[in-house]
Amino acid sequence: MLHTLHRSPWLTDFAALLRLLSEGDELLLLQDGVTAAVDGNRYLESLRNAPIKVYALNEDLIARGLTGRISNDIIPIDYTDFVRLTVKHSSQMAW
């Protein structure tokens, strides 16, 4: 399943998101959700322990001035990669 986090993790039921993640799922951080990719925050630590890959939309990282502050555990992607993720996963959950 592809999970997409559009909102800031501080304004989301992040505990519910973590509970619903399964091995093999992927999470895409976009819009204000990219703030979860900033190195050293508590949400990133929780994502590191999840059995998933985490991506962040590069355009949103740039728009928020976060490109130099994200963790190496986060994979920056462009819109083409975003489309590939949506094609890969038949089911999606937006947060």
Curated annotation (Swiss-Prot):
Domain of life: Bacteria
One cellular component (GO) term of this entry: sulfurtransferase complex
Keywords: Cytoplasm, tRNA processing
A GO biological process held by the record: tRNA wobble position uridine thiolation
Compartments where found: Cytoplasm
Known partners and oligomeric status: Heterohexamer, formed by a dimer of trimers. The hexameric TusBCD complex contains 2 copies each of TusB, TusC and TusD. The TusBCD complex interacts with TusE.
Summary of the function given for this chain in its UniProt record: Part of a sulfur-relay system required for 2-thiolation of 5-methylaminomethyl-2-thiouridine (mnm(5)s(2)U) at tRNA wobble positions.
Family: Belongs to the DsrH/TusB family.
Protein's recorded name: Protein TusB
